[in-house]
């Protein structure tokens, strides 16, 4: 049966006129004998149980519009209280929201009446029966009645429960009058019998929202306007709901048991005003969800703090699909909307924790909690879990919904525990670095090791092949490889001193800036000479220094001149290869022409090996022994062998001079580089200008090394003279050694072996020495 047909008056004679309420859609007709005028349009507020008026009650009058042509009718009595108590309604505009306390009535418990569960029918009663009933409270909207016969009023059935019993209005027995003694309802039970009979004839459709949920605050009447669907949530004129508001705190509406209870004598047992709880529906303004269709509330399994409103299918009204507007995007089908169901503590919690508008920024955590709540939904409902809340500030009022607040009790994710910058590692041993020491990010252990190694001038020797693994566990196994790795990383004592100088300059400039004026204090004081934080040439030379090689000499076998000379030649061949690699790593050397590089190496290979031998002998044995290798040391006993003493005496001269002058490691590195550049062809090099520039650069580096060792003293030039004099004397030493080397190379009867690399160099060098095409670059004239 069509719900509209069941609610239509039977005939025109029986019902002169019926008016549909525009705002809340409650139909009320007033009989002509009582009204005395044409039908009036009355708007009803939210359904609530009206109380009985008292004589001294305040009467708030509201205007009622009448049709044209009714101005000639007689003055109508005041109908501001013309609402039946049994109808469970009170009259008033939606904007004014007149409550029972405003009309001066004793305030009764209010019961929200679902419009989908109430049907309005004519009561086929006579005016005489109506006159015996209680008078209708005066209508606050009627200011003056029009002349003419009274319009009959259409009565409404009380709210019924699922068992079909009518709901008993809250009446205390008072009778109100309409300016006279005319009573609208009798005090006996005849009225309720008629209601029950009419209610049985009423057939509600099976799909009616009233049958689906009996106490849902979102259920609405089938004949009301679509604009009234939000009436249980907020007022009609609420701009936040029209522009996309949501329910922030939705309390469950619990209706009391209002079945009529009758005593044996026929009197009604009415509950006291304090015994009936006041159901309230609290609405909070939100910014991104607009509920525009009735729904069913159900509790989610994920937690007691949330419930969801499910919607499915098409709405009956107008055949339109029910939808939820999320950020202005309308969705249809099954939708989910979450409400905060903490009815006990949410009100006080809201008042304390609700942030102010435009003061506290919105909390951007809505999507996380939303996704967590979507876990128990259907597959077609999970689309809302992927909403992007990044642009929410456009719609936000300055705060977020309590349902969207972060869950502080949730355990942190495993990924958050692993977040953070990775630890910095030492560039030497890969341990955790403690800071930047000597210009390199290192640990404290490598910092102390490097300082002691440099200041103690230790000459570490590797027991292996100079390729030991240096890590946190094995860094103490080989100090030679560890020290080499420190140099390769770029550690330099100059960096520490430079840092101290910078700190001192900054402190000095800070003191000066405090004494100057305000304008000069704002200027940045830059030192005249910026300290050089880049690695110096000496530090680079330390890094590229060749490793100590082993001869592989078997000391268990008796020594002989042939055996020792062969072992020295084989060791010399590997040292030449290492010298070639070292020369190519010298800054600026590879900029020379390739022929010039080969020529310089052919002229200087003996200089390099003898000077390095003298340094090792000076550091290891205080110039008393010749330390060719860790496993091949020439002592006095071996020097006494035939053809060995004279050659060893020339070599010991170099180590003794280094011992006498106490040459530092930086000075040794610069002198060794200058020996590479100490001999050139007589006709010059192809890159002569570049060669001269490179040589002058390392001469200056030698001067810096002297200053570093001696400080700013008058002995610097004297030491520079002594060191350069030693470099000049190296030509005589090398010349004697080359002559003996060429002799043994050419004399096949001695059967002394030469490695391939060394034999090739000697073969190319012999013609040049024989022709005298060699120019010695000396610092001092003889």
From Swiss-Prot:
Residues 140-155 have a biased composition (Low complexity). Keywords: Acetylation, Chromatin regulator, Chromosome, Cytoplasm, Cytoskeleton, DNA-binding, Isopeptide bond, Lipid-binding, Metal-binding, Methylation, Mitochondrion, Nucleus, Phosphoprotein, Receptor, Steroid-binding, Transcription, Transcription regulation, Ubl conjugation, Zinc, Zinc-finger. There is a cross-link at residue 424 (Glycyl lysine isopeptide (Lys-Gly) (interchain with G-Cter in ubiquitin)). The modification Phosphothreonine is found at residue 8. Residues 1-425 are annotated as: Modulating. The modification Phosphoserine is found at residues 46, 114, 135, 142, 208, 216, 231, 272, 312, 410. One of its GO terms (biological process) is chromatin organization. GO terms for molecular function: DNA-binding transcription factor activity; estrogen response element binding; nuclear glucocorticoid receptor activity; nuclear receptor activity; steroid binding; steroid hormone binding; zinc ion binding. A zinc finger (NR C4-type) spans 426-446, 462-486. GO terms for cellular component: centrosome; chromatin; cytoplasm; mitochondrion; nuclear speck; nucleus; spindle. Receptor for glucocorticoids (GC). Has a dual mode of action: as a transcription factor that binds to glucocorticoid response elements (GRE), both for nuclear and mitochondrial DNA, and as a modulator of other transcription factors. Affects inflammatory responses, cellular proliferation and differentiation in target tissues. Involved in chromatin remodeling. Plays a role in rapid mRNA degradation by binding to the 5' UTR of target mRNAs and interacting with PNRC2 in a ligand-dependent manner which recruits the RNA helicase UPF1 and the mRNA-decapping enzyme DCP1A, leading to RNA decay. Composed of three domains: a modulating N-terminal domain, a DNA-binding domain and a C-terminal ligand-binding domain. The ligand-binding domain is required for correct chromosome segregation during mitosis although ligand binding is not required. This is Glucocorticoid receptor. The lineage of its organism: Eukaryota, Metazoa, Chordata, Craniata, Vertebrata. The gene is NR3C1.
